């Protein structure tokens, strides 16, 4: 079964997530949202990285979609979580750095997302913060 992933926030953490997950056979990136960049900008940032160098896949764009190896990934530029359709995602990677409260994160779950992975600490009761290799058992 393929796990469908959406990424909200395509800064450093969002792009590193994409680089890591793109080649996994059981994972498909199906949605990217970043208010700061259109599909053309995101494709350029995906291709060139000052630390990791050029990505081994070709990332281009067609309209509002990033195209990687012929596969189109819709890109939106919405500020509010509710303005992006996350309903087809099994998991959303919340990498914007802005959505860090339980109330704001629940907007994803209301759209049918099964899990949300936040790339920043959530400093609120009742939210599990897991650091791989430290408290992931």
Model-based region annotation:
Residues 1-137:
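N-terminal Rossmann-like NAD(P) cofactor-binding subdomain of oxidoreductases
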